[in-house]
Amino acid sequence: MPQLNPNPWLFIMFMSWTVFLFLMQPKLTSFISTNSPSNKNKTTLTPTPWTWPWT
């Protein structure tokens, strides 16, 4: 049985990353909405005193 050549692993790795970055990632990130902090209301939580069960 012939042995496979492990030489082009670097080329395959770079090509797979470029395919992911330039083809797949823009399509995947178009479905995800960004959570911008400017749209959030500033709510400050006031701490409530803890009621201990033995008091």
Curated annotation (Swiss-Prot):
The gene is MT-ATP8. It comes from Struthio camelus. GO terms for biological process: proton motive force-driven ATP synthesis. Component of the ATP synthase complex composed at least of ATP5F1A/subunit alpha, ATP5F1B/subunit beta, ATP5MC1/subunit c (homooctomer), MT-ATP6/subunit a, MT-ATP8/subunit 8, ATP5ME/subunit e, ATP5MF/subunit f, ATP5MG/subunit g, ATP5MK/subunit k, ATP5MJ/subunit j, ATP5F1C/subunit gamma, ATP5F1D/subunit delta, ATP5F1E/subunit epsilon, ATP5PF/subunit F6, ATP5PB/subunit b, ATP5PD/subunit d, ATP5PO/subunit OSCP. It is a single-pass membrane protein. The keyword Ribonucleoprotein does not apply. It is found in: Mitochondrion membrane. The keyword Transmembrane helix applies. InterPro entries: ATP8_metazoa, ATPase_protein_8. Belongs to the ATPase protein 8 family. GO terms for molecular function: proton transmembrane transporter activity. GO terms for cellular component: mitochondrial membrane; proton-transporting ATP synthase complex. Coiled coil: none annotated. The lineage of its organism: Eukaryota, Metazoa, Chordata, Craniata, Vertebrata. Keywords: ATP synthesis, CF(0), Hydrogen ion transport, Ion transport, Membrane, Mitochondrion, Transmembrane, Transmembrane helix, Transport. The chain crosses the membrane at residues 10-32. This is ATP synthase F(0) complex subunit 8. Subunit 8, of the mitochondrial membrane ATP synthase complex (F(1)F(0) ATP synthase or Complex V) that produces ATP from ADP in the presence of a proton gradient across the membrane which is generated by electron transport complexes of the respiratory chain. ATP synthase complex consist of a soluble F(1) head domain - the catalytic core - and a membrane F(1) domain - the membrane proton channel. These two domains are linked by a central stalk rotating inside the F(1) region and a stationary peripheral stalk.
